[in-house]
Design a protein with these regions (language model features):
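Pyridoxal 5′-phosphate
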Residues: 1-270
Length: 270
């Protein structure tokens, strides 16, 4: 028996679609509507536990418990540890912070690889490192297919100077799906880490980040019916080695070093 999608039920989950002037919204690459359940969860957090979650009183404890529950749930979805997870405001900002956190670990004259298949979020922040004596190498798509050929990556890595390769899991420009595991192996064999933009991928597939062996992976929750938040995954050893971008007292404090200002409580708690 073929299952039939209950369109009316699906529409009823999204209050914005109930507006008389609601437009058809066919721009899933830009984001998604938010269902009532998310709206209710955010509202409940603000009315029940909107306070600093580290305090010892009851409302703070409830808020902290909700945030930690959400972090554990997200970590389980991607097969990672909660202490390898940063929840920040957007992938663009997470990538920007990461670029500043990784630069001190590179030497002048080191190289990084970027692509012309990526969203600006995972391109511009790395290209700007050229202003700090980092060589930026371009891994370009095949102009006839739009694909990135891993064979074209190998010569870019041949001299051993490349410290980082930034590329998308799925390109929101041409729609190509990249073999993340294979590209990661090539980069690792050359001594480079990888930073993968998964924003256009996670709405269609749920990657096992441990199995992919990526060093860093980024995704935005508002592409998948969530609030305007984004996750940055990093292997614990990689996170522990970054330069702190947060308050001085977070130096050495794991993922907090990549989250200046902290997480938006009501959104993360939803």
């Amino acid at each position: 028996m073929t299952d039939i999608l209950d369109v009316d039920f699906c529409r009823s989950q999204f209050p914005l679609l109930a507006q008389a002037e609601a437009d058809a919204y066919f721009e899933s690459a830009g984001g998604s509507y938010v269902p009532q359940q998310v709206i209710d969860a955010m509202s409940h957090f603000m009315s029940d536990s909107q306070t600093q979650p580290e305090w010892p009183f009851a409302a703070a404890k409830r808020g902290k418990a909700r945030i930690e529950k959400a972090q554990k749930g997200i970590a389980a979805l991607f097969n990672i540890s909660p202490d390898e997870l940063v929840i920040g405001p957007s992938t663009t900002l997470n990538a920007y912070v990461l670029s500043h956190a990784l630069r001190p670990g590179m030497a002048d004259g080191d190289a990084i690889v970027v692509t012309n298949q990526d969203h600006e979020a995972n391109g511009g922040c790395w290209r700007r490192l050229a202003d700090t004596e980092i060589e930026v190498r371009e891994w370009r798509i095949d102009p006839t297919t739009g694909d990135l050929d891993p064979a074209d990556l190998t010569p870019l890595l041949a001299d051993g100077k490349v410290r980082l390769v930034a590329f998308p899991h799925v390109s929101n420009i041409v729609g190509s799906v990249n073999d993340v595991a294979a590209i990661t192996r090539i980069a690792h064999q050359a001594g480079a880490m990888v930073v993968v933009d998964g924003v256009a991928a996670v709405a269609h597939t749920l990657p096992d980040l441990a199995a992919l062996d990526v060093d860093f992976y980024m995704f935005s929750f508002y592409k998948l019916y969530g609030p305007h938040l984004a996750m940055l995954y990093g292997k614990k050893a990689r996170i522990d080695a970054v330069a702190n971008q947060n308050h001085f007292f977070h130096d050495g404090n794991g993922a907090a070093m990549l989250n200046p200002g902290g997480t938006n409580y009501e959104s993360a708690g939803a």
